[in-house]
Structures are given as structure tokens and as C-alpha cells.
Amino acid sequence: MYKKYFKRLLDLIISLILIIILFPVMIIVAFLLLVNLGFPLWNEKREREGKNKKVFIMYKFRTKKLNSEKLTYRNRYTDFSRVIDRVRLNELPQLFNVLKGDMSLVGPRPFIPGDNLPEGEISAKRYLVRPGLTGLAQVNGGRGLTHKQKLEYDVIYYDNLSFKTDFKILLATITNIFKIDRD
């Protein structure tokens, strides 16, 4: 019942409240990133696969320098943009994706269309729910996990999807935001 009816309702209510509360923060972050990195403000080509493999544009502030693919990881960011990336403030615009219904607050993180993911039941389960702003994989290793490990966490999430699971993941996400990771 939660997955079918209440999850989306909670996504709508919570994302709207968070957008209202955090909008001034988004404006300040956008301005400071503009000063630090210039235009464009948004990451380009942010197509992602969502529920039922529907492709959507994921909103996210740009924190890397333009044409930085050939630079070392450390040189891709300014000091300021690295901080924004580490505390995930660049992800705040995804609240609009949640409001639109492309994403949920909690769920598997969306993959890029065409990523070489294994076929079969494990991979298919992740597409039965909306992708999330945060998820079980993000609170259990995030960027340090392989695609296979992320898929395993996605299946665990799907099999245990409940209000309690979502609440625990949201609390763990808030805790993780305030931990400083060292690159």
C-alpha cells in the first residue's frame, strides 16, 4: 500500500516543503557557482533512465570545470565547487525532478541510458520504482561501489521497500552529508 499510494504523496509533500525551505540556498549556491565556474550553470546531457526505463533530464548544478575530462580528479574542481560536490548541494535541483514525478526521494540512483548493466531479474527490478535522490547504495558506499554492487543494493531496496526503509535511508543520508570524505 505504501509503495502504490503513499510514497508518491510523501514525495510530493516533502519535496515541495524542501524546495520552499531550500530555495534561498539553491539561489546562493547557483550564484557562487556562477562566480566560480561561469556558465553553463547546469550539467549538460544529464539524461537518466527512470521507472520503466523512461528517459528524463536530471537537474544538477555543474561543479566541474568545463572540458575537465582530461584533467586529474583534483584539478576538475575549484576549491569551492569541490565542497559543494562533497556535501551534495549540487544535487538540490533534483528536488524538482521529485516534484515532477521523474524521481522519488528514496530509490535506486538513476543510471545513464546505455550503461552496460547486466540483463535479467536483478537489473529489471530497479526499473520497477522511481529512481531516488538518495538510496540504499548511497548510504552504503555510494561513489565507491561498482555498478554490480549498486544493483545488489537496488534489489535489496526493492525487496524491502517500506516507509520504515525509506525513513532509515533518509536519516542515514542526512548523517552522511555531514561526514567529510577525503579524496
Each predicted region: which residue ranges?
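Short, hydrophobic secondary-structure boundary micro-motifs
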Residues: 29, 43-44, 106-108, 114, ...
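A short, structured surface patch at a secondary-structure boundary
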Residues: 71-130
